[in-house]
Amino acid sequence: SSELKVAIKKIIKSSPLLEKHFKVMRSEIRCLMCDTEYTPLAYSKDKLDGKLAHLFLADEVGAMDGYPVEAMRSSQITLKSKLGILISTQYPNDDNGLKDEIDIAKKQLDGVYSSGKKYFALLYEPDIELVPDWKTNDSVLYQSNPVAVDNADLFSELKDNRQLAVLYENKRENFLCKHCNIQYKGVGSEGYVDLISVQNCSEDVPDEFWRGKIV
């Protein structure tokens, strides 16, 4: 949230026409025209329910669970014109707030779901049939990074990173998630299976299987 504040501050400072309408303070950015404030909020699991947001901007949603976004949406329930902006690359963890947002956008695009609300999404990810060929197919890079179509330097850098990701497993997760928007769990990702799931399948596994296991 503080990084977003810095970015907004730079935009305001770059334009004399904008600057006179805003007051940039240490803890917030205030719009003098309509007396509203932009306040950076730190991630929390249970302390966002009391906030009232006319508009919210969430960056790196994939790094969070769904609670912060849902808390902000709940705070807007009485507003006629609701607005929330979500920005993120892909992340390897399964419990992230980005997955549902992508699914909702695709379901609305396919006509499977319609909430009656305006929902605008820019999804930069490769076609699913191209994903298995990420090591060699340049279309994966172009679809995930459309700015690279007209930027030869960026495309060359992406190809170099792809080559390293092919050669080194420990570089693969970052490349696929951050530069291709493909969810991938590489080496070093922490795996977790809850106890209830283990208990449900324990009867189907011989007792010898569990002996000597490091947990």
Could you say what each language-model-derived stretch is?
Residues 3-54:
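Inter-Walker segment of RecA-like/P-loop motor cores
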Residues 59-63:
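Walker B catalytic acidic pair
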Residues 46, 64, 93:
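Glycine-rich nucleotide phosphate-binding loop and flanking beta-alpha elements
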Residues 55-57, 85:
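Structural motif
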Residues 67, 73-215:
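Non-catalytic, compositionally simple segments
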Residues 15, 24, 41-42, 70, ...:
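Residue-level detector of functional hotspots within protein domains
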